């Protein structure tokens, strides 16, 4: 069995990857999108340069993610004469681009180690579950109970993941989970509802024009701040950037002169409380990483505002896209055609000015969490 890590692989792998992926000039900002097929091709070339054994076949590439839900690499298996014969882990966070590899009849990759040792706590869908890199050489899968099982035999709380990180660019696929008000009137009957007396919004073009910045969580909190009379309408830019700073929002990209930001969910509630305190407004917060519908309706019913954070798999990129929105009401709807009931949150979506209805029952959320305020 051969097992080595990091340094010895650097030269070999650089030569391997250069033979597969074209090298761009430094001023070219193009990003190579590594596909399953390319991961297999990379793995096979790597194996041929290391093992010098014929008939090794790479297969079953499995994408893995960092703790924020961003794809960072692949685990690829090897077969020799139709029998398992090791694996390689490509990891873009490692300098060598390979974090580990192993060849041999008894080599099990991190995913297999977890699933084989803890099979009784995983659902039937576990074989398609996402695997997360928790630490160097440690990986985890979320089990039936919402716990993370790792290849080191540890059981961790799901809160070690920050999958709810909110990113501030508008993916087109959000139209699938957000209903416009005219669509609601046309296709649904209202079962029950409650909402704040005033709908507050600051559309994205306006925010970008006055601040040169945009982050969905910051825009959502600006609406919350306005609701609690903590916003100075003569200095929207100043308040926006104060919220940006108090929540630890970081730059995720820049485009067209606009700086886009990313905010970790765990910072949103406390950061907003600090912002309000600076305005002599007393507000408390509660963040739930697995809220039910009542978590939001109870907040609205007592006359407070909330922020919903959710993630989907973008049909454009195949990757998770996250978004945070101010929840200013709720509505249970019944579809005219099917009679199905839909639970929605009435949200300021961060992009436009009008209320939209977020389908809380959407069955393909990658994650959904919330922050409620009391003030």
Task: Briefly describe each language-model feature range.
Residues 223, 251-333, 337-340:
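Predominantly the structural core of cysteine protease catalytic domains
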Residues 40, 44-59, 64, 104-131, ...:
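Active-site-adjacent structural segments surrounding the nucleophilic cysteine of cysteine proteases
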Residues 8-19:
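Bacterial N-terminal signal peptides
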Residues 17-31:
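Sec-dependent signal peptide cleavage junction
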Residues 124-127, 132-133, 144, 292-294, ...:
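Active-site signature of cysteine proteases
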Residues 72-79, 138-143:
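Short beta-strand elements that form the blades of beta-propeller/WD-repeat-like
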Residues 69-76, 300-308, 342-346:
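Short, hydrophobic/aromatic-rich segments at coil-to-beta transitions
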Residues 33, 78, 82-124, 295:
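Long, charged/polar, surface-exposed segments that mediate recognition or autoinhibition
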């Amino acid at each position: 069995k051969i097992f080595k890590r990091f340094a010895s692989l650097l030269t070999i792998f650089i030569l391997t990857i250069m033979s597969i992926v074209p090298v761009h000039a430094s001023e070219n900002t193009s990003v190579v999108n590594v596909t399953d097929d390319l991961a297999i091709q990379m793995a096979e070339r790597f194996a041929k340069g290391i093992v010098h054994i014929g008939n090794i076949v790479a297969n079953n590439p499995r994408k893995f993610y960092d703790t924020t839900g961003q794809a960072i690499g692949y685990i690829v298996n090897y077969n020799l004469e139709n029998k398992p014969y090791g694996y390689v882990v490509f990891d873009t966070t490692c300098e060598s681009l390979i974090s580990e590899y192993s060849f041999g009849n008894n080599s099990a990759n991190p995913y297999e180690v977890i699933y084989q040792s803890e099979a009784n706590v995983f659902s039937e869908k576990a074989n398609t579950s996402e695997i997360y890199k928790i630490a160097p050489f440690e990986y985890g899968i979320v089990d039936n109970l919402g716990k993370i099982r790792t290849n080191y035999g540890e059981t961790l709380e799901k809160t070690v993941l920050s999958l709810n990180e909110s990113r501030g660019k508008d993916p087109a696929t959000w139209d699938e989970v957000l209903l416009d008000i005219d669509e609601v009137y046309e296709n649904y009957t209202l079962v029950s509802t409650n909402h704040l007396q005033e709908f507050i919004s600051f559309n994205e073009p306006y925010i970008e024009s006055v601040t040169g910045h945009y982050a969905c969580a910051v825009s959502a909190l600006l609406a919350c701040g306005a609701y609690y009379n903590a916003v100075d309408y003569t200095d929207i830019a100043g308040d926006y950037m104060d919220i940006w700073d108090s929540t630890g929002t970081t730059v995720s990209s820049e485009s067209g002169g606009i700086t886009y930001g990313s905010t970790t969910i765990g910072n949103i509630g406390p950061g907003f409380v600090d912002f309000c305190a600076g305005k002599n407004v007393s507000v408390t917060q509660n963040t739930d990483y697995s809220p039910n519908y009542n978590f939001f309706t109870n907040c609205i019913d007592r006359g407070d505002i909330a922020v919903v954070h959710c993630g989907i798999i973008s049909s454009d990129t195949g990757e998770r896209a996250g978004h945070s929105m101010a929840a200013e009401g709720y509505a249970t709807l019944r579809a005219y055609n099917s009679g199905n009931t839909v639970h929605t949150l009435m949200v300021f979506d961060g992009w436009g000015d009008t209320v939209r209805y977020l389908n809380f029952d959407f069955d393909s959320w990658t994650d959904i969490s919330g922050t409620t305020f009391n003030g």
